[in-house]
C-alpha cells in the first residue's frame, strides 16, 4: 500500500456545515429521533470513503452505528447526538465537532452572545473533544490491533487537528471571550503514547529465572527488532508522512534500551555481564538491529547513536581487557602446571603420526585464540587491543614454560619417559612457531622476541638428547691425537658408525627438528675434529707430511659432509670448514697461505689469530716471521660482524 498523506485521508470541510443548536432544539431532536432514526447515520456517511450497499456494516465502525445510508440529506447532529456517537466510538463525529468548534468561534467573534453562554457552549465542545481524543488515542495506542479503516480514521482526525492547530497559530490570538484551546497538540500526545507503549513492551521481563542481564538484553533486542519490523511493514503504509511513525517508535525504543543499559552499567558487573553489555552496545545493536535487512533503510539515517556514551564504553572496554588478560594468564598457568605434573609423574607423551606429542601448545593456542575471537566479536578494534595485551602475556608464559622445562631436564633424568617427554616438548615449539607466524602478523623483531624462549627450550632439549652421544664420541675423537693421526680414516669410520647407530633415537622428532638436530650434530663433528687438529701435538716439518695430512683431512671432511647431509643436515655453511684448513696445511707459499686465511676469515668471522696459530703450528717448516706475516692478515678483518652461526667461538685454544 502506498503511503497516504493526511490530506488524502480527510475530506475537506464545508463552511457552516454544522450550526450550533440550543438545548431546546436538542430536546426536540430527541423526541423526533425515533421518527428519524437514520438521520445521524446519513450525516456520518459523508466521512466514509467508498460506497457500500445499504445495510452493509463498515469495518471501521461499531455494528450498531451501521445503518442504511441515504445520501447527504438530514439535519446536522446535536451535541447530545455527537456525544452519543463518540461514546460508541464513531470517529466520523470528528468533522461535525470541528464544525461546531468553528461555529462557536464565529459566534464569539461576531458578538451578541453573552460571555456566560460562550463559556457554557465551549465547555460542551471541550467535553466532546475529550471524548474524541480518548477514542482516537485509544485506537493509536494499539494500532496493530485496530482494523485498517478505523486506524485511518483516527489518523485522519489527528492530521485534521494538526492542521487546525497550524491555522489557529497563523491567525494569532483572538479577542473573543473564549478560552484558548489551540494548539491541542494531539500529534505530540500520540508520540507520548508511543513512548509509553515502548516502555510497556520493553519493560516486560523474560520468564522467571531469566533475569540475568544476558537474558534481559536478548529480550530487549528481540522485542525492539520485531516491533520495529512490524511498524515498518504494517504501520508505515497507513500513517501519514508527517507522523514519522518509524522514527517515533525507533527513538522511543532506543531511549528505553539505552536507559536500561545505562542503569546496568552503573553496577559492578561480572566478566560475563561486561562482555554481554559490550557485545550488545558495540555489535549486536548496531549490526543486527539498526542495520538489519528490514530496518536499515529506515533507521540508518536517523542518527539514533550508541546505547552508551563513548566514555562509558571505553571504561567497560578497559575492564574487559583487564579481565581477559587475567583469565588468559590463569588458564595458561593452569595448563602448564598440568603439563609439568605429567612430566614429574613420568606419564608418557601421546604419539601422533609417529611423533611424540604434547597438548600444551594446542591448549595455549586455543586460550589466546579464544580471547582474541571474543574481543573481535565485540569490535575489530577491541580485537587489535587485546592482541597487544596477549603480546605481553604470551612471552611471559613462554619464559615460565622454559623455566619449568629446564627444571624437568635437571630433575627428571632417571624417569623412564624422560627422553620421550623432552622430544614432545621440542615438537611443541613447531606448533607455537607456526601459530605465531601465521596468526600474529607482528614485526620480525617482535616475533624474534616471542620465539626467544622457545629457541632456548629447543636448544637445551637438543643438548639433553645429544649428551650421551657426545660422551660416547669423546674417546673416539681422542684417538686422532693419541695415534698422532696415524689412522685418521679408520678413526672417523668408528665415529660415523657410532653416530649412525644412535640416530633412530631421534626419529620421533618432527622432521624440521630432526634436521636441526642433525645440523647440531654436524656442527659437533666438525668442531671436535678442529679441536683435535688444534691440540698442538702434531708438528710436521716436511711438505710431503703436510700434504699427506691434508689429504686425510679432505677425505674425512667429505665423509662427514656426506653422512650428515644424507641424514638431513642443512648445514651447507659447514662444508668449507675442514677443506680450507686442509688447504692451509698443504700450501707452502706464505703468500698463498695468507690469501687462503683471508678467504677463510670471511666465511668464519670468529676464526681468530689463536685458532690460526694452532693450525700453523702443525707446519713445522714455517719461520716465526712467516707465521707473524700470515697472522697479520686477520688484522684487516677485525671489523667484521659477529657470525650468525658460531663455530670457532665454540673452540677454546691457547
UniProtKB/Swiss-Prot annotation:
Organism: Homo sapiens (Human)
Name assigned to this protein: Tumor necrosis factor alpha-induced protein 2
Upregulation: By TNF and other pro-inflammatory factors.
Bias-annotated ranges (Basic residues): 28-38
Keyword Transmembrane: no
Family recorded in the similarity comment: Belongs to the SEC6 family.
Alphabetized GO MF terms: SNARE binding
Biological processes per GO annotation: angiogenesis; cell differentiation; exocyst localization; exocytosis
Purpose: May play a role as a mediator of inflammation and angiogenesis.
Disordered as annotated region, ranges: 1-38, 50-78
Superkingdom, taxonomy of origin: Eukaryota
Keyword Nuclease: no
Record keywords: Angiogenesis, Developmental protein, Differentiation
GO cellular component terms attached to this protein's record: exocyst; extracellular space
